[in-house]
Amino acid sequence: MADPPHFSLFQQKFRTGDKPFLTLDADFLMNHTKVLLKSDASDKVWKVKLDGGRLSEGWEEFACDQKFRDGDVLVFKHHGDEVFHVAVVSPSVSGDIRNASSSQVITEDTYIDVDDVDDDDYGQDDEDDDDDDDEGEDNIENISEKTDKRQEADSSSDHSGFITARVTRYSLLHDRLDLSRNFTLLFGGHQKTCEIDVVDEQGRRWTMKLAKNISSGVFYIRLGWGNFCCANGLTQGDLCKFKLFQNEERPVLWLCPQESGNGRKEKRTFDEVSKGKEKKTPSPFLIVKYTPSRETTGQLSLPVSFTRNNSINKTGEVILLNQDGRKWSSYLQITGLGRGAGSEWFYLRRGWREMCEANGVGVNDSFKLELVWEGANPMFKFCSKIENHEYKGKGNQRTRKKRACETAPQPRNVKKTPRLGVEGPVYQVDEERGHTQVSNRTNTISGNLQRLLPPSCSVSDQVANVKQGIVDSLNTVRQCRTELETSEQNLQASLLAIDALGERIWGISKILSSNLV
């Protein structure tokens, strides 16, 4: 296990919902995926996952157990290996820590290498009043500003800090990322080109070239930036935050984890969830009916939705087979091309009647097929014959409803005028006089009319019947159109045959004429 980092104490201001980011060096982050947190409140040791320096899973439970409040200043003291002691400090102790020597301040997170501060000093409860808390918060802001200025002025080899960079279209096209001015302040006045390691959140390293633009004085990295973006899902417009380390053989830029609410993180999570969802697989089964018209034309049409959902989009030879493995050759033909979207449909041109005959399927019988793919070629497997009684009940019920609506008595020359009765507007119909007659027996006649009309003749049933009639008419038109196309093809073939026969007759007559001469 790697040696613990050289720092031992630093502090953070607690905010509900936030997860503290601990500025740990690269070696520690590469060799540790968790930390162990202790406090004076109990002897329990809390295991908290470490996500690139940020405390993640387990931190909220620890904070809830410790009853931290917004604005509390938390001090993390490193006890070696993975153990950190966490305590809430009072404003006075916080000021002492913050007023430490500038040479001991290392990064944005205020921490110093202090071993002479006892746990009891910063483990005491905060008993000061609100005025002291406000004064302590002002001191924190003032010291933070001073710390930032010291960081910019400090260019020593052990200096570490944060820089931000945005992924642009130019950087992706030219495999180059221009670093911010802050990097120049942190890195110093190095003029020569050198190598730099860029490390992602998972600890993977990319060695790139670090160079400086002489005219602008801005540093940039190249030769590997595009691969880094591709491996980490970085796209144009993403904002990246790096931490700079200079205590190794070459400088290191460590990609910091994205904070909650970042667009790139949310986008990646959404993409992963979307990819994880299983796609709905279309059904390969099809139920068709052996109708007299199909017997006549020899064409078994397939539903458009079935062919579209199963990606059947080209014509060609297909194989029909049954449960015994017997095969029939068929051809999948398309018709209706050039007539607009939804006008094309496929049909089987031959072989299917022989298959039905071999499997006991006759005219007006239904049967079930299964689509099986053999590479890129579809095959249709005969599954079973479906007895007519399976659909007879539902079909007869619909027919009975339709007939009841058609045969229901309809009033002649009816004019209606509303009359407010006990239960609302009601009507009485006088068929002989052709107009509405007011009566005191409105409720009785209304009840008689309701008994005369069958319950199936509601508006919704009539709409359904009309819709079904339109669908049936459309199917009939399509079938007739298919039959006309087939007849046209047959007539054209007959014309070609007649032309060929005429040529043969003309040739024979020519031979006979030459012989007679």
From Swiss-Prot:
Native organism: Arabidopsis thaliana
Expressed in which tissues: Expressed in the shoot apical meristem (SAM), in the inflorescence apex and flowers.
Segments of skewed composition (Acidic residues): 115-140
Location relative to the cell: Nucleus
Lineage of producing organism: Eukaryota, Viridiplantae, Streptophyta, Embryophyta, Tracheophyta
Any one of the GO BP annotations: megagametogenesis
Function: May play a role in flower development.
UniProt GO MF annotations: DNA binding
Extent of Basic and acidic residues compositional bias: 143-157
Gene: REM1
Keyword set, alphabetical order: DNA-binding, Nucleus, Repeat, Transcription, Transcription regulation
Keyword Nucleus on entry: yes
Range of residues in the leader sequence: none
Region (Disordered): 115-158, 393-415
One Gene Ontology term, aspect cellular component: nucleus
Residue ranges flagged as DNA-binding region: 7-92, 162-259, 285-385
Alphabetical list of CDD domains matching this protein: B3_DNA
Name under which the protein is recorded: B3 domain-containing protein REM1
Superkingdom as given in the UniProt entry: Eukaryota
Family annotation (InterPro entries): B3_DNA-bd, DNA-bd_pseudobarrel_sf, REM_fam
UniProt-listed Pfam families: B3
